[in-house]
């Protein structure tokens, strides 16, 4: 069938550190609200990192029955909740759809560390015969897509992409390709994560990837010269992607159009992006080429922007490499300045942000940004902007050199 089918966004859902719906999340974004605070899940007395961006007031009973909730770890509960919101928002009635043409592409970078920690303790204390029989289906990352498909009767292609911090963006991009090539008419797509656990925080701390700041206002400060690591977040964002004519036939509202997807691999280092930015630059240019958009037509990028020294520097180099002098005309922001780094869900949350920015003509500021260093000399949005956003490019860069960019545009007939 080729790549000639247009793909639009018709529904969105979000469980985030600043709100448990798209409306709450977006209002928080416009207010410059941050979700950072002391870790409450465990005692951090022996940890250098004491801050995280936890989801607040989440009640799985609002989205599923008790039996289902017990058979899911939190990363799956977040995904099922956000997917339910998105499907409801889209007005998608599965009884009216061919279930084999409605698929699922929901990824998690890590799966459930909670289940692994809990059952490992049981193994050490009581022996191998006492390890719970549900450990494996509870912890493996593909159960996010599995549980979403089970919960909503999605019988089409079901994917679980695992590309670390690029998971959410790859998941949406692969769902987009699935619809383009005619393998589905509708895809439920996004990412989810819940890794604020003792081993999760200890592991990322050992990498020196996390901020050790105890001041929530100076913990996640992408592109600032005082940046010292990311703040771990959690949550999920899910979107309904739909073939345009299918959406029009059922009278669906259309938020925006997904029009380009680009990927690359740095083939450079297990944690660091390529220093020259060439891999990320290639992903961005591939997304623009896929969407038929010239680099100089783009005005806005939602950056990966993690608040680590290397990422923000190397992503800046990538933008300059891809856009040349036009890089200085771009507005670039980081949603992680408010919600932290949601790992496998980060790209999906930032995708929802881009949809809302296109819809409302608003580019949010990078909260906490005060002063940059010499090589970081682009416009990283110290202030918000109210202006037309015809296109939005969002980047995700994952451990292992996984790069993904997707291009959205304002929907026009």
PLM region descriptions:
Residues 23-28, 114-128, 178-181, 201-214, ...:
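A glycine- and small-aliphatic-rich helix-loop capping segment at beta-alpha/alpha-beta transitions
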Residues 79-90, 144, 171, 242-244, ...:
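Short, well-ordered amphipathic alpha-helical segments that serve as non-catalytic structural scaffolds
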Residues 9, 25, 30-163, 192-201, ...:
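Conserved beta-ketoacyl condensing-enzyme motif
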């Amino acid at each position: 069938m080729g790549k000639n089918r247009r793909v639009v966004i018709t529904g969105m859902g979000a469980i985030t550190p600043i709100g448990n719906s798209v409306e709450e999340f977006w209002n928080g974004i416009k207010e410059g609200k941050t979700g950072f605070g002391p870790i409450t899940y465990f005692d951090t007395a022996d940890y250098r990192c004491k801050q995280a961006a936890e989801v607040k007031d989440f009640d799985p009973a609002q989205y599923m029955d008790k039996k289902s909730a017990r058979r899911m770890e939190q990363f799956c509960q977040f995904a099922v909740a956000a997917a339910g919101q998105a499907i409801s928002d889209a007005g998608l009635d599965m009884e009216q759809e061919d279930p084999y043409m409605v698929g699922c592409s929901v990824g998690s970078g890590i799966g459930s560390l909670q289940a692994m920690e809990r059952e490992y303790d049981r193994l050490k204390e009581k022996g191998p015969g006492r390890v719970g029989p549900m450990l494996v289906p509870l912890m493996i990352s593909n159960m996010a897509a599995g549980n979403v498909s089970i919960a909503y009767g999605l019988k089409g292609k079901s994917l679980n992409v695992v590309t670390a911090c690029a998971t959410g963006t790859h998941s949406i991009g692969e769902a987009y390709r699935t619809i383009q090539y005619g393998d589905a008419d509708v895809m439920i797509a996004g990412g989810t994560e819940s890794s604020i656990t003792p081993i999760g925080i200890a592991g990322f701390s050992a990498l020196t990837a996390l901020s050790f700041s105890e001041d929530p206002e100076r913990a996640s400060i992408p592109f600032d010269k005082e940046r010292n690591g990311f703040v771990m977040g959690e949550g999920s964002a899910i979107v309904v992607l739909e073939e345009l004519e299918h959406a029009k036939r059922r009278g669906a509202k259309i938020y925006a159009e997904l029009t380009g997807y680009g990927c690359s691999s740095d083939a450079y280092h297990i944690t660091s992006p390529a220093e020259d930015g060439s891999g990320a630059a290639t992903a961005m240019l591939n997304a623009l080429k896929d969407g038929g958009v010239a680099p100089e037509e783009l005005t806005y990028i939602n950056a990966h922007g993690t608040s680590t020294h290397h990422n923000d520097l190397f992503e800046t180099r990538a933008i300059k490499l891809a856009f040349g002098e036009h890089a200085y005309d771009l507005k670039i922001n980081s949603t992680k300045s408010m919600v932290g780094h949601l790992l496998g869900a980060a790209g999906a949350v930032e995708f929802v942000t881009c949809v809302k920015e296109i819809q409302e003509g608003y580019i949010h500021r990078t909260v906490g940004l005060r002063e940059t260093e010499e090589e970081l000399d682009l416009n990283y949005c110290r202030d918000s902007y109210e202006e037309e956003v015809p296109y939005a490019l969002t980047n995700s860069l994952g451990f292992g050199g996984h790069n993904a960019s997707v291009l959205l545009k304002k929907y026009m007939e």
